Amino acid sequence: MKAALLHQFDKSLNGPDWLSYEDVSDPVMEEPTDVIVRIGGAGVCGTDLKLIEGLWCDHMRIELPIILGHENAGWVEEIGVAVESVQVGDPVILYPTAYGDLEGSGATGSHHFRKRGFYPGFNRNGGFAEYMLAEESMLLKLPSHLSPMDTAPLADAGLTAYNVARRASKHLAPGHYTLVIGAGGLGHLCIQILRALSSTEIIVVDKSETALDLARSVGAHYTFVADEHYTEKILALTSGKGVETVIDFVGKDSSVNKGLFVTRRGGHYYLVGYGGRLTISTLEMIRSEKTVVGVLGGTFSDLKELLTMVDRGLVTLTTREYALNNANKALRDLKDGRNYGRTVLIP
């Protein structure tokens, strides 16, 4: 089969081609609950760039070469003898980790924290290929009118956006404000989910006017360019109190510092993006009683609930498609900020 492989890390992200498009052996089932999926679409994520940088090597054993791709959807091609929940030909989306306990606590709990299992695109070959080896516990059937090409990024970007919006909505009431930092692939999904789950007033900041146009089109109430003055505008809008909730999809030093600054006393700051440093005095944390929460992925139940929202038309996904053999261009465009919404590779 054809696949896009990472053979070496590039800490500076200055190399000409990060992935090699080549012929590799088809995946082979080894366990009775294994499933071979024919990939219909594989989302390209900012985390893929972090993997190429080697940023995850301190947190996970990554053996090269590896096929990246942790946002995957397609059709069941072959099933193991013990597989019961899907049949050959079923369209499916793949939860981004596998644990072999579809009916156990992993189906509802935070099983993305467990040590057992594997992570396609991280420590096992992922979906930047024509076929991928999966496990039955990862698979969720798609509604008949949703295609793998259009839904693949929901497997992680959508999952994460749903998780953080669900958690934030528990603290939101009419008249409350939520600041979303970053209106891109995750941000435009989070805006829609927040509107479906809460009555919060949504403020969005981004450095790109095009991204802010996307934010407005999916329901943002207020948008500001992420310049040196946007915190003043947010404080003016909120009568100097600040916002009840911040959801930061950027995670750089400047976004964290400014986001915490406009979080009101007793407010919640959800950190999804990463790459920067979180620095705040312990006295300030005590005095302000702010809560800072890191968010990683979501549960299998989150993915089910998100798909129900998409099926009902409450959430729509904006995508740009590339052929699999153009994976390097897709990654380069993502790095350079030329894509809005989510990027999908099509084998």
Positions of PLM-derived features:
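C-terminal hydrophobic helical "lid"/dimerization subdomain
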Residues: 3, 257-260, 303-347
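Glycine-rich beta-strand-centered segment in the early N-terminal region that forms part
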Residues: 25-42, 56-104, 138, 143-145
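Cysteine-cluster motifs in flexible loop/terminal segments that predominantly coordinate metals
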Residues: 45, 96-137
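Residue-level marker of beta-strand positions
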Residues: 71-73, 91, 131, 177, ...
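Mid-domain Rossmann-like dinucleotide-binding core that forms the NAD(H)/NADP(H) cofactor-binding site
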Residues: 137, 144-228, 232
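Glycine-rich cofactor phosphate-binding loops and adjacent beta1-alpha1 units
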Residues: 169-174, 212-291
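Residues in the short beta-alpha loop(s) of Rossmann-like NAD(P)-binding domains
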Residues: 208, 275, 298
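Rossmann-fold dehydrogenase core element
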Residues: 268-270, 280-320
